[in-house]
Amino acid sequence: MGKIIFYEDRNFQGRNYECSSDCADLSPYFSRCNSIRVESDWWVLYEKPNYMGYQHVLTRGEYPDYQRWMGFNDCVRSCRVPTHTQRPYRMRIYERPDFGGQMMEFMDVCPSVYDRFRYRDIHSSHVMGAYWIFYEHPNYRGRLYFMRPGEYRRYSDWGGYSSTIGSFRRIME
C-alpha cells in the first residue's frame, strides 16, 4: 500500500496529513502544500479536487518545496496511488477525436511525437495496458497528463486543454 505525507510548509514543517489511498478532495486536511514525502509507491497529484487540473507524478523520495516536483504553486487538492498492473505496455494514438484519422500503436517511449507520428496533435487515445504519461513538449518536458488504461475519445478526457502532445512514455513500476 502506498503512503504519502503532505506538509503545509517547506522543509517538512507545519501541519501535515498522511494519505494511503486515493483522495478526491484534500482540502479538509490542509490549506496549502509546500513539501511532500513519498514513503512508498508513486503518486499522481492534481491541482484541483476530483482529479482535475495540473498533474504531477511523484516517485518515492523527499520534495522539500513544490518546485522540486515542478509545481507552479502550493495547491494540491486531490491525489491517486495507481494500482500495480501486470499488463503489457500498449497504447494507440489518433489524429482525430473519437478514434478517427491516422492511428499508430506504441509499446515503447516516444521522445518526439512529431518525428514518429508526423502530427503534433493527438485528439484521442486508447491505453490498453499499464500507465503512460503524455507531455506537452518533446523530450518529456512541460505539462503532463497521467494516462490510465481506458479509452480517451477527446483530449479533454485526459484533462488536456489542447490536443498538443510533444512526447510520451510509460511509467515503470
From Swiss-Prot:
GO terms for biological process: lens development in camera-type eye; visual perception. GO terms for molecular function: structural constituent of eye lens. Gene3D superfamilies: Crystallins. Pfam families: Crystall. PROSITE patterns: CRYSTALLIN_BETA_GAMMA. InterPro entries: Beta/Gamma-Crystallin (IPR050252), Beta/gamma_crystallin (IPR001064), G_crystallin-like (IPR011024). Residues 84-88 are annotated as: Connecting peptide. SUPFAM superfamilies: gamma-Crystallin-like. Residues 2-40, 41-83, 89-129, 130-172 form the Beta/gamma crystallin 'Greek key' domain. Keywords: Eye lens protein, Repeat. Has a two-domain beta-structure, folded into four very similar Greek key motifs. Crystallins are the dominant structural components of the vertebrate eye lens. Belongs to the beta/gamma-crystallin family. This is Gamma-crystallin S-2. It comes from Chiloscyllium indicum. The lineage of its organism: Eukaryota, Metazoa, Chordata, Craniata, Vertebrata.
